[in-house]
């Protein structure tokens, strides 16, 4: 993993913005904080985005879970993680208004002036509306509903920041159900993230016609795909994952697929 970047002074902030960090959208966006820039806050990961075509830096298992849920949502067209809240004077004014201490940079030796820390929102989503327009939603990710007082203060600064610029703000709290759904999406889409599109050479309609809504054992589906296309078990499993990940098959993601060995097909492109 690459070395962490230094963001300890106002000059550092200016240089980062000049390098395009924290600005832009889609493939060009660079998160303000990367996995290597922060001390461990859980299971950090870097995941290639199927919609953005860039690496996403996710700082905890709950962030990863939310990312998979958001990416799988057809309305979401862009995901910007670790989004910086600029200008600093606005978050400072909000903190002063609320009589809260603004987050400060810590542990900088030889710096006589206190430096305001750049606050970030875990995710800024761009969504396509039913009418064809765009809207934005800011998401703060939390492990559970029990939030310490200081954390709640920072969340209130964050909420008011987005309110002032007319962007919806929401707190996402991890749950067992969402963890199961996210894990299933992660599994199904993992075969798509290298961009190889290996599935294109197979006439998948031959499979889809056979998959009426029902509950199927994975081993049976894998054997059927192997038989029809003459591929080994690993390739057959990858094709099954691709059909789910590409939403050719609509399956019930609310129970653990790999743990149960079962897939409940709700519908597909032909049924």
Where are the regions that the model predicts?
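Electrostatic, structured charged patches in enzyme active sites and in nucleic-acid/phosphate-binding
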Residues: 1-271
